């Protein structure tokens, strides 16, 4: 509910704390679960014991760089890019291949423009929310527009922006390319999920793993860096046939996704976690997958 401050003529949302609280709980939940899941190194694959083409692979473990065949719920060795688990990586928790690949998609998400705004507000309350006075003792960059004048709230500490160690956030524009590669990898996993022991079919997890790269694609291709890559550094879209017909069309698609960046950020985050949960439960035998193979 918006309430008007009669002294400053500002509109202030009395429930401003709900959004950062939900973000805090959501991100902490995902970090806790994904860390636990990556630590396991087992039960991330299901094919009902069949070793032919096809099966369900958790997105947390894709691609499977190494495989420890002694663990339950792991793919056949021919799915491994580099063979069995090497001794020189025995120090990794759980001897889990997830540690070798999660760094790439997580670096993209962690440095995402939306997520930066989200966790700055949720974890450091800097700023706590739009048009909300800063928390006492914290630096702030919040500004309010009052009667046409911009008045910065003064918390007594200087706000320096993303400087110093926070400059590493600039890796986002490079992590973006790895994120795009992972969309194709997970799309192959979705294709793989349509088969079991070489037989075509459909299961519940087939649909889950198919939706996963779609949501990740909507999130990734709505990225601000991709939008700049497509439409940035141009003064005129219609100055050439290429820019008019191709660049502008691509830019409009990316802009459509960009306007829904927050939505797809959360949908894709929740769905990738849900995908791992389902594969894990089926692989452990806790639930049965409903599928056309009858297994």
Feature map (PLM): residue ranges:
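C-terminal transmembrane module of eukaryotic multi-pass membrane proteins
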Residues: 217-295
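Hydrophobic alpha-helical transmembrane segments and immediately flanking/interface helices
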Residues: 183-211, 272-295
